[in-house]
Amino acid sequence: MTNIRKTHPLMKIVNNAFIDLPAPSNISSWWNFGSLLGICLILQILTGLFLAMHYTADTATAFSSVTHICRDVNYGWIIRYMHANGASMFFICLFMHVGRGLYYGSYTFLETWNVGVILLFATMATAFMGYVLPWGQMSFWGATVITNLLSAIPYIGTDLVEWIWGGFSVHKATLTRFFAFHFILPFIIAALAMVHLLFLHETGSNNPTGISSDMDKIPFHPYYTIKDILGALLLILTLMLLVLFVPDLLGDPDNYTPANPLNTPPHIKPEWYFLFAYAILLSIPNKLGGVLALVLSVLILVLMPLLHMSKQRSMMFRPISQCLFWILVADLLTLTWIGGQPVEHPYIIIGQLASIMYFTLILVLMPVASTIENNLLKW
């Protein structure tokens, strides 16, 4: 009798995706982040579901309901902090996953890469709306400032902002719709993740060398299932260290003050994972220019396949490109730091230089380096 996992219509899908899937024999720990993102998503949906059972999406009671969850609900505090810090872990894994894709040239799988970029935008939208829900000072002012950026769009901008707000300011209607979107988007993300996997399994995984590994494949189970379990344990360990020892490390103290439209916090800033884009936004004095740069800072990922000039796929054997890649990483860390600082000298000029550096590295220096490396190969 044939094994049920190979014949049953549902089990067959699982089998072909996670058990008998042919995988390259040389993929490193950088290939663990896909499964870690899946775990993060499941964790966020589960903790979010339990939080939604006690949360009220109303300006009068939202802040109190979060306090109630932390104080009165059984293990509510741990669910709340797992959800908040789970978002940070999600973005750490996302940045590592995207960075891996850039380094090893995974963007040459066009469909997989483009679905991935859509996933990144969807996750950023979800995280932004989630940050508004506790209705603290930074929730309210963050929502006001970020949504207000859309007013920079010519002609339709102001109407668009008022349409999103459901009125003339961020108020009850805004909070209710943000909660609705924050609840539905993770399920859309889950569906997109399946499409992402579907496209990936059409081509098979990339590997550190960037060379076809068709002649050297191994089954996903047990080799990579056990490797993914180790990654998952390390992820959960890191998350629980954050939750149990320093739950507010990555949060903002201003969010423990209830939202007050009459009192603006001294430094309005988003969560840490948006600071790089926020720094790019602030580095341009013009409002529309800043918004365009903000969107382009992430949308530039779509251009990566077009900017790939090298004859080799991966950066494994390209030392000049490697140097530029790590300079880009350092530049992004600099932007993240600047995004959290007040808008004053010397932070303004550092932010402007880091922003110029960011776009120059991706659009000019990396393609030029690839061309130089191609010529060096001829020698």
Swiss-Prot record:
Keywords assigned: Electron transport, Heme, Iron, Membrane, Metal-binding, Mitochondrion, Mitochondrion inner membrane, Respiratory chain, Transmembrane, Transmembrane helix, Transport, Ubiquinone
Topology relative to the membrane: Multi-pass membrane protein
Cofactor: heme b
Positions that bind heme b b566: 97, 196
Entry's transmembrane regions: 33-53, 77-98, 113-133, 178-198, 226-246, 288-308, 320-340, 347-367
Summary of the function given for this chain in its UniProt record: Component of the ubiquinol-cytochrome c reductase complex (complex III or cytochrome b-c1 complex) that is part of the mitochondrial respiratory chain. The b-c1 complex mediates electron transfer from ubiquinol to cytochrome c. Contributes to the generation of a proton gradient across the mitochondrial membrane that is then used for ATP synthesis.
Quaternary structure (record): The cytochrome bc1 complex contains 11 subunits: 3 respiratory subunits (MT-CYB, CYC1 and UQCRFS1), 2 core proteins (UQCRC1 and UQCRC2) and 6 low-molecular weight proteins (UQCRH/QCR6, UQCRB/QCR7, UQCRQ/QCR8, UQCR10/QCR9, UQCR11/QCR10 and a cleavage product of UQCRFS1). This cytochrome bc1 complex then forms a dimer.
Protein known as: Cytochrome b
Protein's organism: Raphicerus sharpei
